[in-house]
UniProtKB/Swiss-Prot annotation:
<keyword id="KW-1227">Viral tail protein</keyword>
<keyword id="KW-1229">Viral tail sheath protein</keyword>
<comment type="function">
    <text>Polymerizes as an extended structure around the baseplate-tail tube complex. During ejection, the sheath shifts to a contracted form, thereby making the inner tail tube protrude through the host cell envelope.</text>
</comment>
<keyword id="KW-1035">Host cytoplasm</keyword>
<keyword id="KW-1160">Virus entry into host cell</keyword>
<keyword id="KW-0946">Virion</keyword>
<keyword id="KW-1242">Viral contractile tail ejection system</keyword>
<keyword id="KW-1171">Viral genome ejection through host cell envelope</keyword>
<comment type="subunit">
    <text>Homomultimer.</text>
</comment>
<dbReference type="InterPro" id="IPR020287">
    <property type="entry name" value="Tail_sheath_C"/>
</dbReference>
<dbReference type="InterPro" id="IPR035089">
    <property type="entry name" value="Phage_sheath_subtilisin"/>
</dbReference>
<protein>
    <recommendedName>
        <fullName>Tail sheath protein</fullName>
    </recommendedName>
</protein>
<dbReference type="GO" id="GO:0030430">
    <property type="term" value="C:host cell cytoplasm"/>
</dbReference>
<keyword id="KW-1162">Viral penetration into host cytoplasm</keyword>
<dbReference type="Pfam" id="PF04984">
    <property type="entry name" value="Phage_sheath_1"/>
</dbReference>
<dbReference type="GO" id="GO:0098027">
    <property type="term" value="C:virus tail, sheath"/>
</dbReference>
<dbReference type="Pfam" id="PF17482">
    <property type="entry name" value="Phage_sheath_1C"/>
</dbReference>
Length: 356
């Protein structure tokens, strides 16, 4: 029972720190340089002097961050991984598989490298249940984990391509708390962009492009959306919003981490303990509802569908079992939970499955 008491404490701490953690994201940058290196930086002062001038500039963009009521918010860390002309982006991606980050970017990526990054992000999100996402330029990925930035900008009189500005965009997103959206967030250093009319801007947004617009005297993010354009019953409009995907990802991460670290390792996987774990998750979500991150009408329960699949795989005649018998059935070391919740500013429910 002590293990479950600790779980409640852990969930309370995670709920309390949710907003703070959401605005202290980690940006990972893949760079091409003359030497191979991997570094984790916490400020511009940590930038290696041996890097090229362009690479130093990309990293500085990664530390610009966001503003909240005139307070500057920055990523908690910028990770850089470089490779030489003899190297391959696949090697860097393999290296990053064991690294925790929120947003990946590659300011000098060619088309083939962008495609490989998209494929890799999709794979690790599916296989590893990671919250990793990427900010790339001019690529129609049609995926909630890929932000497609398509705007060239002028900074200090110099035109900067969308590709080379992805580190700045990643920094903005990673530093914005989940209580806010990046929609209309200003990019104060940008002096000008190519002017387009509202209809053209709306069409770009509908096509899953993250673009900039001049509004109220400043150049701002037009709409905080990712590249997802194909909507399904499982992935509706809320999956197009960067803020909501970030919130969903962090909730999933918190619950799964506590489940693995504090529940599976310390508590027998009995039905009674599963119910106590559900109560702990409910308490965590209640705290998030108080912070207006999710709606208060949520449910947490044993995932009957997945439970049935597990039992059928064990050659158990599920058709002859009552619902309560299925819920209470022994699932070995596996746990199947279904969370239904509504993220604030969304009009539809989402399901989060926790399966271990």
């Amino acid at each position: 029972m002590a293990g479950l008491v600790n779980i409640n404490i852990e969930f309370k701490e995670l709920a309390t720190s949710f907003i703070q953690r959401s605005k202290a994201g980690i940006v990972a940058i893949i760079l091409k340089d003359t030497t191979k290196m991997y570094k984790e930086l916490t400020s511009e002062d940590d930038i290696p002097i041996s890097l090229s001038a362009d690479n130093k500039k990309y990293i500085k963009y990664g530390f610009v961050g966001a503003t909240d009521n005139e307070k500057v918010l920055r990523p908690s860390k910028v990770i850089i991984s470089t490779f030489t002309e003899d190297g391959k982006v696949e090697d860097i991606l393999e290296e990053l598989e064991s690294v925790e980050f929120n947003y990946l970017c590659m300011p000098e990526a060619i088309e083939a490298e962008k495609t490989k990054i998209v494929t890799w992000i999709k794979k690790i999100r599916e296989e590893e249940s990671t919250e990793a996402k990427a900010v790339l330029a001019n690529i129609k990925a049609d995926n909630e984990a890929i932000i497609n930035f398509t705007e060239n900008v002028v900074v200090d009189g110099e035109e900067i391509t969308a590709e080379k500005y992805t580190t700045r965009v990643a920094s903005l997103i990673a530093s914005t708390p989940n209580t806010q959206s990046i929609t209309y967030a200003p990019l104060d250093e940008v002096e000008s962009i190519v002017k387009i009319d509202k209809a053209s801007a709306d069409a770009k947004v509908q096509a899953g492009e993250l673009i900039l617009r001049r509004l109220s005297g400043k150049i701002r993010i037009a709409r905080g959306i990712n590249s997802l354009t194909t909507l399904t019953a499982e992935k509706g409009e809320i999956f197009q919003k960067i803020k909501l995907v970030d919130t969903k990802d962090l909730i999933s991460k918190d619950i799964k981490n506590i489940y693995v670290e504090k529940y599976l390792r310390k508590c027998p996987n009995t039905y009674d303990n599963k119910c106590l774990f559900i109560v702990a998750v409910q308490s965590y979500l209640t705290e998030l509802a108080k912070q207006e991150l999710i709606d208060s009408n949520f449910t947490v329960e044993i995932d009957l569908e997945k439970q049935k699949e597990y039992l059928e795989g064990k050659k158990i005649a599920v058709s002859k079992m009552k619902e309560n018998e299925i819920k209470e059935a022994n699932t070995g070391s596996n746990g199947f939970y279904l969370i239904n919740l509504k993220l604030v500013d969304a009009m539809e429910d989402i399901n989060i499955r926790v399966q271990m």
